[in-house]
Structures are given as structure tokens and as C-alpha cells.
Design a protein with these regions (language model features):
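N-terminal secretory signal peptides that target proteins for export/translocation
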Residues: 1-8
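Sec-dependent N-terminal signal peptides of Gram-positive bacterial secreted proteins and lipoproteins
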Residues: 8-28
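Acidic, contiguous N-terminal accessory segments
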Residues: 28-178
């Protein structure tokens, strides 16, 4: 009887050990390398430039007319992460945040098309492009919901910045895979 109990106990221990192997978290997706931002969920593509951009405490806002109130609130929340103040009349030497919709003809659409936005990307569900370069941060969404997701990605990046408020030049392209 004692031998049977030991055998059953060993099987139970072996089973639990195997079960624990499947409970260990596994990292999936793109691994960040040193100096890259951690963005979750992982975007379709991130391209980093060679420079960093200094954010100013005052941010000039240019928000397209197709952007809804929820996205405008997300913009304010994003700026608040670094205690930045946004307004439409900030001086031209300030960081500029431009948010708009692809195909609308607004400032974000014009900038995006001149800086790599392609129709094929925006044929996808919830597609957006986030571009940080030359004193400008541009979020161009397929629609206002996609622009919201782009601003949310910017918020995640802002949460990782140090007190010096320097952000790497980059382009993020993302869309949902359904």
C-alpha cells in the first residue's frame, strides 16, 4: 500500500511540475532594444531616427475638424503626462502637435502625405501614423477613432520620457489585424 501511495505522489508532483512550465509567462512580439520605447500592443512598424527632439512646455496645437471630443480629451491627458500646456496660438518656436484624419485635407493629412503616409496603410482597420520629427508631432488616423489610438501611443511614449522631456525622432505605423 505504501508503494502505491508513493507512486501516486510522484505522478502528482510530475504533473504539477509540467503544469508550472506552461504557467511561465512568455514574451511575444518585437523585443525592444536599448534606447527604444516599449509600446503595447506592439505596432506594425516603428522606425527610429538618429536625433532626439526637445519638447517645449508650451505646445502649439493643430487639431483637424474631424477629430471628436474623446480624442481631444486624450490629447489633453497626453500633454498632462509631462505637464505640457497646449493651445492653438503658441509661438512658432514651440513643439507642434498636429492631429487629423487621412484624406481630410487638414494639416495632419497634408504633413502625413508629404512624409510617408501611403493609402495602402490607411486601407486597414484603425490605421494611424505617428511621426515625431523637426519640432513636430503628427498623428494621422484613418478616422477619429484611429487618431485616438495614435494619441494613446504617444501617451505611452510620454510616460517613458525622463524629466528632460527629450523624445526620439520616430515614425510609428499601426493598424488592427482582424
Amino acid at each position: 500500500m505504501k508503494k502505491k501511495t508513493t507512486s501516486l505522489g510522484m505522478k502528482l508532483v510530475a504533473f504539477l511540475a509540467m503544469l508550472m512550465l506552461f504557467c511561465i509567462p512568455v514574451s511575444a512580439g518585437v523585443k525592444e532594444t536599448a534606447g527604444e520605447y516599449e509600446i503595447s500592443p506592439t505596432p506594425q512598424e516603428i522606425t527610429y531616427g538618429d536625433k532626439e527632439m526637445q519638447l517645449t512646455d508650451q505646445v502649439k496645437l493643430s487639431i483637424g475638424s474631424d477629430i471628436d471630443d474623446y480624442t481631444k480629451t486624450r490629447i489633453t491627458d497626453t500633454l498632462n503626462v509631462l505637464k505640457l500646456t497646449g493651445n492653438e496660438s503658441a509661438a512658432s518656436d514651440k513643439t507642434e502637435l498636429i492631429v487629423g484624419v487621412y484624406g481630410s485635407g487638414d494639416a495632419a493629412d497634408t504633413y502625413g502625405k508629404a512624409n510617408g503616409a501611403v493609402q495602402a496603410t490607411f486601407d486597414n482597420y484603425d490605421a494611424y501614423m505617428l511621426n515625431v520629427k523637426d519640432g513636430k508631432i503628427v498623428v494621422l488616423g484613418k478616422d477619429t477613432d484611429a487618431a485616438f489610438y495614435g494619441v494613446t501611443t504617444l501617451k505611452r511614449i510620454f510616460e517613458q520620457l525622463s524629466a528632460d522631456k527629450k523624445i526620439k525622432e520616430l515614425t510609428v505605423t499601426d493598424y488592427a489585424e482582424v
